[in-house]
Swiss-Prot record:
Matches recorded under Gene3D superfamilies: TonB-dependent receptor, beta-barrel domain, TonB-dependent receptor, plug domain
Family label: Belongs to the TonB-dependent receptor family.
Annotated TBDR beta-barrel domain residues: 186-754
Descriptive protein name: Probable TonB-dependent siderophore receptor PirA
Taxonomic source organism: Acinetobacter baumannii (strain ATCC 19606 / DSM 30007 / JCM 6841 / CCUG 19606 / CIP 70.34 / NBRC 109757 / NCIMB 12457 / NCTC 12156 / 81)
Localization per Swiss-Prot or TrEMBL: Cell outer membrane
Compositional bias segments (type: Polar residues): 404-414
Region feature (Disordered): 404-424
Disulfide bond annotation, renumbered to this chain: 511-519
Entry function: Probably involved in the initial step of iron uptake by binding iron chelating siderophores, thereby allowing extraction of iron from the environment. May bind the siderophore, ferric enterobactin, with micromolar affinity.
Pfam families, per database record: Plug (PF07715), TonB_dep_Rec_b-barrel (PF00593)
Length: 754
């Protein structure tokens, strides 16, 4: 990155800060004068002060989950249980391989979890980046959607397509913004207990307890908020999938511990300072999973680990926020420091044992540190048209150290092929992104709103990127509104893809079909960033009790980063026979991560909501027309061809309510085309190992629950999930049926509020 760019970005940040402070001294006097001389002006200003971000969140590609929604359909542990019910959202892996199938994460519009950005109160979380990135693009992680307990959440915003592009790298599919409960000027709080008990004794149960409390330390000046959570979800039995002849593991368990505090200081009527500190621990309960479905019961090492904690994530976050509400507009400054320690047993890095735990020694720890600064100002004014201008800058720096995943090809003499390909300390990686953005929300007419945006990102290795955007809202009449948008989204290479010291190897089966043996996959510091031109166009109808919409979306995905198929060189290496001690000298073919030309995502989303007051019925659907890597012909991820969600909510009395939920998943087709020698039928397994395309048939799940309020303080809820017991079992011989859908379970919660 050039020094000039860095200096420019930092200069704008400093200037924004100085402007905020300079205007602060004049603010109270100016507001008083405006109130006396022009009393109508503040009211007028308030009515048009809608920022570009707020306006874009009115797009059809945006859904909001409220705290009441989470109370009426409680999640077992992870908010992904509820987010998956939104249009365009599914749970899947980051590729169409089905690897790590039971570690499904939030996928938006088929772009994969790596293109879904998780935010907490608008601040990104990237702890999953500390987990090793596999040959096919998978990580052994549950993602970043489980760092905030449901009890602490005020709402969840799910942004899809063009609406998400403003958030920068990693939001090409969409954004999930978890908004926590605010501090209060009166003491309020709650404690909730939740349990879920499966009918099938081989499935893991779940129990959690959480609390949230907030109140003043100094009335009207200093307030606090504190929340905490403990959850334990047991692992499935190691033999849960044996009934269909599969050795694949079931879902692993998880133990969560979370604590978070906030101090809010109302420094003046115009200025608020927030201090956020949180600490979390997530540990797994091992159930036998490995990247390539090894038989855990037959493996000497894996069989000893069943039921134990093989990986633990520790996450600490510190953030300081200044919010200003001035006579000229609003400002926000954020400084954030996140630290993730990923402690886990070492895994293989070669061929058929990639991703499989290979010893019982002490866990190794990789360390990820992220420093983030963001400054933003929103300025309303009128120049030909009423408008609100947004200007902002951002600086993100990641420093990462992984001593275990960067050891392939290393030997004590320093002459291994890994040592030849990458000199120095291979374990250290880093990344920096400097960004600046400008947006303008224009009120063209009473019925027309236009939001223009332009974002610039400069990455320390992949260079610069410009991301323009346009969103339009046009009211056609009292009932119909046309909404559309187009934006260029962006994703920088991850640190493993960029690191020349990160090597994976295969003796032949994992090589491209045209390479007979011995392939090395090496990180590439010359990768381009991934980009996607995201478009959507839809119509909304609102009248009386009806709210309906239909939206077409299309993502033209370019330069997706994948494992390379072209030999860029060779390197000398050697291997030692463990039985005879004989040394064999070999040559390895070097592949590198590379940008694949194009991919296409396209489909429709629709919704229909009926609100009768005490009765509410909300429905949505997603239909995937296209999901294809144009180079391989395979889908980008494993998602149903269609999904239908329906929630029926009836408040029978002020104390009693009942909820019914139904989801229908369409067929899920696997990859159709081989991508290596083994799948092509020319590897060591011959034709028996050739890729066998498969399909998960359409299926549905349903649930029901009843809630009752004993008083303003005490409430309870009991229910049944997967009411008709449609259980899906993971099949190690299938490349589409790659996950477990749990069967019928009974759950209950008890909440005390004060």
């Amino acid at each position: 990155m050039s020094k000039r760019i860095i200096q420019s970005v930092l200069s704008v940040s400093v200037l924004a800060s100085m402007m905020s402070m300079a205007f602060a001294a004049q603010n109270e006097q100016e507001q008083a004068e405006q109130t006396l001389e022009k009393p109508a002006e503040p009211v007028k200003l308030e009515t048009i002060f809608v920022t570009a971000e707020e306006q874009v969140k009115q797009s059809l590609g945006v859904s909001v989950i409220t705290k009441e929604d989470l109370e009426k359909l409680p999640v077992r542990n992870d908010i992904s249980d509820y987010v998956r019910r939104m249009p365009g959202v599914n749970l899947t892996g980051n590729s169409a391989t089905g690897q790590r199938g039971n570690n499904r994460q939030i996928d938006i519009r088929g772009m994969g979890p790596e293109n879904t950005l998780i935010l907490v109160d608008g601040k990104p979380i990237n702890s999953r980046n500390s987990v090793r990135y596999g040959w096919k693009g998978e990580r052994d992680t549950r993602g970043d959607s489980n760092w905030v307990p449901a009890e602490a959440i005020e709402s969840i915003e799910v942004l899809r397509g063009p609406a998400a592009a403003r958030y920068g790298s990693g939001a090409a599919g969409g954004v999930v913004n978890i908004i926590t409960k605010k501090v209060t000027n009166e003491t309020h709080g709650s404690v909730e207990f939740y349990t879920s008990q499966p009918e099938d004794s081989k499935e893991g149960s779940s129990n959690r307890v959480g609390f949230n409390v907030s109140g003043p330390l100094i009335k009207d000046v200093l307030s606090y908020r504190l929340y905490g959570n403990y959850n334990k979800t047991e692992a499935d039995d190691v033999d849960i999938n044996k009934s269909i002849g599969s050795t694949a593991a079931g879902r692993e368990g998880v133990k969560n511990k979370d604590i978070s505090g906030r101090l809010a200081w109302q420094a003046t009527d115009q200025q608020t300072v927030l201090l956020d500190i949180s600490s979390s621990k997530q540990g797994n309960i091992y159930s036998g999973d490995s990247q390539l479905n090894a038989n855990a019961e037959a493996d000497a090492i894996l069989s000893q680990l069943i039921g134990k904690e093989t990986n633990t994530m520790y996450r600490d976050s510190y953030a300081l926020t200044h919010e200003g509400d001035w006579s000229w507009g609003k400002s926000k400054l954020v400084a954030q420091y996140d630290k993730t320690h990923n402690k886990r047993l070492p895994e293989g890095l070669a061929g058929s044992v990639e991703g499989k735990i290979n010893n019982l020694d002490d866990k190794a720890t990789s360390r990820l540190e992220t420093l983030r600064f963001n400054g933003e100002a929103n300025i309303p004014f009128e120049y030909y048209l009423p408008q609100v201008l947004t200007v902002g800058t951002e600086w993100v720096e990641d420093r990462f150290k992984d001593n275990v995943s960067t050891t392939q090809g290393k030997d004590s003499s320093g002459s291994g092929y890994g040592d030849q390909l990458a000199k120095g300390d291979r374990s250290k990686m880093e990344s920096r992104i400097a960004s600046a953005y400008i947006e303008d929300n224009l009120k063209v007419t009473d019925s027309t709103d236009v939001v223009l945006g332009l974002r610039f990102d400069d990455h320390s290795k992949s260079g610069s990127n410009w991301s323009p955007s346009l969103n339009i809202t046009q009211k056609l009449n009292d009932y119909f509104t046309l909404k559309g948008g187009v934006a260029k989204a962006y994703k920088a290479p991850n640190m493993y893809q960029n690191a020349e010291g990160y090597l994976l190897s295969t003796n032949g089966n994992g090589c491209p079909a045209n390479i007979e043996s011995r392939c090395l996959l090496q990180g590439n510091g010359d990768l381009k960033p991934e980009t996607s031109v995201n478009k959507e166009l839809g119509i909304q109808f609102q009248k009386d009790i009806v709210n309906a919409s239909l939206t077409w979306f299309r993502n033209d995905y370019k330069d997706k980063i994948v494992a390379g198929t072209h030999v860029v060189g060779t390197v000398d290496g050697s291997s030692t026979n463990a039985n005879t001690g004989a040394v064999t000298n070999t040559k390895w073919n070097i592949l590198r991560w590379e940008n694949t030309p194009k991919a296409l995502i396209q489909g429709f989303e629709g919704s229909l909501g009926l609100d009768f007051g005490d009765i509410r019925w909300t429905n949505n659907f997603t239909y995937m027309m296209d999901s294809k890597d144009k180079q391989t012909g395979n889908p980008l991820s494993l998602v149903p061809i269609y999904t239908i969600n329906s929630i029926f909510d009836y408040d029978i009395t002020d104390q009693l309510d009942v909820n019914f939920v139904f989801t229908q998943y369409g067929r899920q087709k696997s990859r159709q085309f081989a991508e290596n020698r083994l799948e092509s039928g020319i590897g060591s397994g011959g034709a028996n190992s050739a890729l066998k395309p498969s399909t998960v048939k359409s299926y549905s799940t349903a649930g029901i629950n009843v809630g009752y309020k004993f008083s303003d303080q005490i409430s309870t809820r009991v229910g049944v999930s997967n009411l008709f017991d449609k259980q899906i079992l993971r099949d190690s011989n299938s490349i589409s049926q790659t996950y477990n859908e749990p069967g019928r379970a009974y759950y209950a919660s008890l909440k005390y509020s004060f």
